[in-house]
Amino acid sequence: MHRFLAFAILIGGVARAETVLTLPFFNHADSANLDWVGESIAESVRDALASEGVLVLDREDRLEACRRLSLRPGAELTHASVFKIGDSLDASKVVYGFYELLPVEPGKNQSKGSLRITARILDLKRTLQGAPFSEIGALEDLASLEYRLGWQVLQQLNWKNLPTQEDFLQAHPPVRLDAVESYVRGLLATSSEQRHLFFTRAARLDEHYSQPCFQLGKTYWERKEYKIAAGWLERVTRGDPHYLEAQFFLGLCRYNAADFSGAEQCFRTVAAEVPLNEVFNDLGAAQARRNDSQAAIASFQKALDGDSADPDYHFNLGYTLWRSGKFAGAVESLRAVLQRSPNDAEATSLLGRALKQEGPRPGDPRSEARERLKTNYEEAAYRQLQAELGK
């Protein structure tokens, strides 16, 4: 993803949009049992920034950069290493820091102690390290601490339309500590079985915790267990940075479960905010399966307008035109498929029937449900491009 964006910026001749990288915070708590907290802070701050529209690099981008630079996960990084990671990802700013556990105050034996999180922002454009700022509170209130820190980061970035801290925290309700720990341990797990175990535990410990639901939904989607995946994806809340991606995959799950009306609703929700070609394509497929050919043709045309090089968009448009008896348009679209993909046997067969003005035969499986779906979702690429274009 990141390499694709860098290439797009280079050939487009537009200014690179400002992006922020959040690194795991370093453990100064003298307890290896709290190593997971550093990853939790990074993820929560990232989610907090993303929820306000900041372009934030993905965890996968950061892990890949560390691999390329041969940096050991979990190790405390030098200032030079922090700079190298950010620079390798073309980040504008890097958020990083450390946390420490303070002794339990007398009379508060039920407390796990207080956590002090200290953060800094490194401005890579000006090679300037900002002054440290911190949040302190009970370890049990880690989620709230992290979101308060996220609000401070937004403040330090001079983010436009910054909500009040009260409104910001209302939009990010607290999560149980044990649920947060389970979720983060799921992110850090090295096997799919461990990830599933930890994410499921996190979702059960706090039923309002959206992030593990998204992870579980994606897991079941990849296993093609669409009904179970849909159940998890439906629980991803509007305030979650993954909400629109969850809606996209929920639409695919519903489509595969033959709930075409529900799929259309999901794709419409996504298209209203992230009008990707892939989303319009899948919206058109859902509309076509509902026998709304006029709407489907319009949606497929939007996908095609965005990327005329993709043979699948030409195929879907041609196939729907053919089913609608619009043979001349179908011939044009199907020929466009074969210009881009000469070995497409299905397009060749349909083109022959369109040239003969021979429509679909009732009950013929070769004529039914031939729409081609897209399963890649590139919201980050879209948002970065919009930022670069100043929209």
Regions found by a protein language model. Give the residues of each.
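Structural marker of alpha-solenoid helical repeat scaffolds
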Residues: 205, 238-239, 272-274, 306, ...
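Short beta-strand->alpha-helix linker/helix-N-cap micro-motif
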Residues: 18-84, 88, 92-108, 124, ...
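Mid-sequence helix-capping/hinge segment at a functional interface
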Residues: 144-189
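Terminal, low-structured helical/coil segments at or just beyond the last alpha-helical repeat
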Residues: 339-391
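Alpha-helical segment of the N-proximal tetratricopeptide repeat
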Residues: 175-211, 215-224
